[in-house]
Amino acid sequence: VYENFSGEYEVSVMFSAHEGEESTSFFGSGFTTLSLDRPFIELSSLERDLTDVENQLNPRKLEGKFTGTMILTPATLNEFMGNIIGNFASDGVILDETSIWREKLGEKVADERITVTVDPRHESVVCGENMTAEGFPTASFDLIKDGVLKNFHLSLYVSNKTGFDRAPCSSLPCIIKAGDTPLDEIIASTEHGIIVGRFSGGEPGISGDFSGVAKNSFLVEGGKITGAVSEAMISGNLAQMLNDLIAVSRETVSDGDGIAPYMAFGGITVSGK
């Protein structure tokens, strides 16, 4: 018998913009909430997502290639952070000893402005976890604090097999620390870059190398957003980009599963398809 002792509203919206025969690619936005007191458009990043998709009509095709800044939206940052944790700090890669972070507990693995806390009882997390999958009471813990690797995200089984500490939480509600730089200032200081609203690519390699298409994205040139861009490829390395952080935004988005800011990373290769 399975019983559920919590309840929430889960909202998922898919949409695209249309004007005449022109249309954008589909984009998805979603969040979890306990209350229906506020209009959906005021929650999470839905209003900005709708506006961004509207502004992605008639995109320009990127030509050539440059190495520059990648600005990740909060949703895309969460996606990248999930890949980082999966690639370097999760059960499988720690057990089979393929993680490049396996021997780096207590060492610096990221810029000191990066702090990632797993907190299932944070006030922004809707219906968080009270017990782990193994039956332990949950607790918050830091994965990365001020750039230093503090913990892996391990089950009891892998903890017993490897000797590393078990994670105090089975789920992964990440609270990513905000910075003190307004997003507008981050954009204004970007000479050549891309704001990535969605990433479409394969699984990163063991080393953290990634490559894929930047979807629902905007080109930044000379400190200004110059328009939507299509057929842009981005590539880099997950481990290296954490150390190539340029800025963390003051603004954050809470989607009911965690909190994330915008982050800008240098040294990313951006090229036309």
Name each region found by the language model.
Residues 1-129, 136, 145-146, 224, ...:
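Active-site bordering "gate/hinge" segments
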Residues 103-273:
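Dual-mode signal for accessory low-complexity, basic/Gly-rich regions
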